Design a protein with these regions (language model features):
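Accessory alpha-helical/coil subdomains and C-terminal extensions
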Residues: 2-140
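Phosphate-moiety recognition in structured ligand-binding domains
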Residues: 150-179
Length: 179
């Protein structure tokens, strides 16, 4: 799937998670793919149908992530709605460009692994708990991982047409050139 399909997955996942969060109020953190580009995380905003729908907070890698501001944002959102749904790109980093959390492992391309381990979700959940000292706050975190770019049942019509056209072209080219 292309961007439209991946964005659809993210938006639908947040729609579902927001419904769950309404029923079981608390704080939910979802980590979305995006090492240095936040377009998939930004697509989570498509889940908003009403003013109080989540995600309430969206953090992109193109913006500096400030831990203290994050904690205050969560406190403010909880005060306003009694719940909070957060979309965080796996590539969020501090003012010095350091990732907020890593697993310490490297991927097959030699890049620091950001979201494959769930480390960022755990880090953000711990920061949320720090924001409410002495209070018992329900906090959950998930990492969408590869599902957002490969989930077969939500392929957009545009992506399906383009994939089919590329496949047809490849077969015709191979047949006409003998390659």
């Amino acid at each position: 799937p292309g961007f439209a399909s991946a964005a659809r997955f993210v938006a639908l996942a947040f729609m579902g998670d927001d419904r769950d969060n309404r029923a079981l109020q608390g704080i939910k953190v979802n980590v979305v793919m995006g090492r240095s580009a936040g377009f998939l995380t930004a697509a989570s905003a498509l889940a908003r149908q009403a003013a109080d729908d989540g995600p309430h907070l969206i953090y992109l890698p193109e913006r500096v992530f400030d831990v203290e501001k994050f904690k205050q944002d969560v406190r403010d959102t909880m005060a306003k709605y009694g719940r909070c749904v957060i979309a965080a790109s796996e590539g969020i980093s501090d003012k010095d460009g350091n990732p907020i959390s890593t697993s310490g492992e490297k991927d097959s391309h030699g890049n620091i692994q950001l979201s494959g381990s769930g480390a960022l979700g755990d880090t953000l959940a711990a920061l949320v708990k720090e924001a409410f000292p002495g209070q018992k706050v329900r906090v959950r975190a998930d990492t969408f991982g590869y599902l957002q770019r490969s989930f077969p049942t939500i392929i957009s019509p545009v992506d399906a047409r383009e994939a089919r056209a590329v496949g047809d072209y490849a077969v015709n080219h191979a047949a006409s050139t003998g390659q």
